[in-house]
Amino acid sequence: MFLNIGFKSVTMDDISNEMGISKKTVYQFFRNKSDLVAHSCNTILDTISKDIEEVESWNLNPIEEMFEARKIILRRLKNEKTSPVYQLEKYYPKIYETLRKERFEMMDGCLIDNLRKGIERGYYRADINPVIISRIYHNGVTGLKEKEFYDQHIYPVPYLMNVFLEYHIRAIATPKGIDTLSDILVKDRNKSSMMPPSAIGL
């Protein structure tokens, strides 16, 4: 509900109605709405983390892993119309800051592992620094949601994430990696997800 409606808009009454229980019962498990928001954010992050771990168990090549991880994140955080991240930052700044740090730690670990694996298998250049590249990637992805730079009506987040991931891979890939990327793009690209609405007449 928080992702679909927004952290500010959802009330404890909404939660109790959605779950089919009394508000008193909700308060038996959560002290207040802030407590519920914090637990919900942790659950979302844990779910994404477990999904990514599952992808890593599929024995894909490192570039395929990145594209599958992107699909998971977009699926889990599919509703950007309510700007849940902005609402969280504005109305629950302490929770937002904690989540931001935990999200960075999760992403950083996954990316560094992916980069090292890519170097070892010949998909990424041997001269890159995995720690630095991981942080550059993290900052870049985070910046995609800056409204003053990207009009979400013209450039929706899924489109921006696709563009940025391709940009990231091209910057670090070997010829072998570029060939793999090209194969993935041929199979994966479709106008609705890879092009902004303005480019397809919406």
Regions found by a protein language model. Give the residues of each.
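Hydrophobic alpha-helical connector segments
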Residues: 39, 50-83, 134-137
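Amphipathic, non-transmembrane alpha-helical scaffold segments
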Residues: 37, 41, 45, 96-104, ...
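Secondary-structure edge/capping motif, primarily at the C-terminal ends of alpha-helices
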Residues: 55, 84-88, 144, 148-151
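C-terminal peripheral helix-coil segments that are non-catalytic and often amphipathic
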Residues: 113-117, 121, 154-202
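All-alpha amphipathic helical-bundle segments outside canonical DNA-binding/catalytic cores
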Residues: 64, 102, 120-136, 154-163
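Short secondary-structure transition hinges
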Residues: 78-113, 119-132
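Helix-turn-helix
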Residues: 1-35, 39
